[in-house]
Amino acid sequence: MIKELMNMKEIKNGVWPVMITPFTADNQIDYDAVKAIIDWYVENGVAGVFAVCQSSEMFFLSKEERLSLAKCCIDYCHEKGVGVVVSGHVAEAVEDQIAEAQAIIDMGADSYVFISNQFGAPEDSEEVVKERIEYLLSRIECDSFGIYECPYPYKRVISPELLKWIASTGKFAFLKDTCCSLDQLKAKCEAVKGTALKIFNANGATLLESMRMGVAGYSGVMANFHPDLYAWLCEHYADEDKQEMVQEMMDYLGAASTIECQVYPINAKYHMNLVGVPMTLVSRTKNPELLTCGVPVKCDGDAFPSSKIMEIDQFCAVEKIMRKYFFG
């Protein structure tokens, strides 16, 4: 295990956005916008990027698109000096999963991230999951893996007991946790103590308390809206002289995180335009009219934007107020 830990790339503490995929008007991946998003992440203090995940609409990308997107993100993140972990673990056949994982690893990802629900059907026991993880590890050449408790097509939350075993393999460095339970997070932090496996919380409301328990940072939807605010919290959560501001930031981030229940990821794509990262609202998972209601985003004359568009406009305005309050 010592040799494996020496070869494992560092997964830095902090913010790891779940990267959205921008598309052109004719529904192709917009690689110029992909790079612009990464630039924006880096400018806003992220530790790394989680690419080709559910927010990336990976279930709606072809194999060729998943691999092409992975290579673009890996190469550009390396160029920008920021970490990158990659999934794309959606193939049905296990041998196809192995081949695709190896291809992404060979591109230079810091860690290849398995989807936990791909380890077995909902009714399968954790013993079955262990056997399947062991098989994958025996077939894939890689020093660093991760796991994402992806909620689609069903959510398989890793138990603290299983996580302890996973960490003991010495092969895992990253867990994107979606349990949203402080009791479970506390037990999971205990389970990985003293190992290389770091837990990243996907839930905004529980983030502060979970970091006090040992969680390494945030990897969730809201890093597509204000990664800088999450980065500030991750950096200062333990500062004794800032605890009042830390709690105020947490209160804002927890309340603001409810916007992900609106029309994500389309609202995130619209928000990107508001902060200077242009892209279409095209998505393969939702109709943009769920956000726009068929009304042009920029209205002239007697037309008015949809209420959901106005919500994101107002959301962005409040973000600016919060930045002024916290950063001056």
Task: Report each predicted region and the residues it spans.
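A local structural micro-motif
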Residues: 49, 85, 112, 174-175, ...
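Catalytic alpha/beta core domains of metabolic enzymes, predominantly
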Residues: 135-143, 150-264
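Repeat-unit-sized solenoid/scaffold elements
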Residues: 113-130, 176-192, 216, 299-308
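Structured C-terminal cap/extension of enzyme domains
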Residues: 42, 209-328
